[in-house]
Amino acid sequence: MSIGKTPPRGETKYWTNGKYPWVSISDMSDYGLVTTTKESVSENAKSLFGEISPAGTLIMSFKLTVGITSLLNTSAYHNEAIISIYPFVDKNYQARNFLFHILPIISNLGDTKDAIKGKTLNSKSLNNLLLPLPPLNEQRRIVAMIELLFDKLK
């Protein structure tokens, strides 16, 4: 897991000639795919961020609007209200897809704190979330059932 960062807004060197997508919660949608972002950061911002989150990464909001999950359609950086989750334990992304659906439920059961603008999970409460992790075959079955139900809602 890795928590994002926001470059200083007053320093234009990070925001001018943006080359890399920068995700904020407003770019995410419940159970969605982040394909575009409202903002991007420059080459100068790379030194602040470290590794970019690759396409396919599961991201989740944990501040203000706790538990929104999305998948990155492209490599991107993100702000400090979002966490990248790397459950790449299998080539078919079964664990990632399972967490994509289960984390919105589990994260809202966590020890959230009231902040000025809404609920938030801190690093300790994120680490203390108890996640049910059935075997990969069972995760695949659960995800298939959830996606079938979502398809019926469309």
Give the label of every model feature segment.
Residues 23:
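ATP-grasp fold ATP-binding core
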Residues 9-11, 70-72, 114-116:
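Short beta-alpha junctions and helix-cap segments that line functional grooves
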Residues 60-61:
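A generic structural signal for residues embedded in beta-strands
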Residues 89-95, 132-134:
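Catalytic cores of nucleotide-enabled group-transfer and carboxylate-activating enzymes in metabolic
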Residues 1-6, 30, 128, 132-154:
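Non-catalytic DNA-recognition/assembly elements of restriction-modification systems
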Residues 76-84, 116-133:
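A short glycine-rich beta-alpha junction/loop motif
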Residues 1-12, 26-55:
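Sequence-specific dsDNA recognition surfaces
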Residues 64-68:
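Short, charged beta-turn/beta-strand-edge "cap" motif at the junction between a beta-strand
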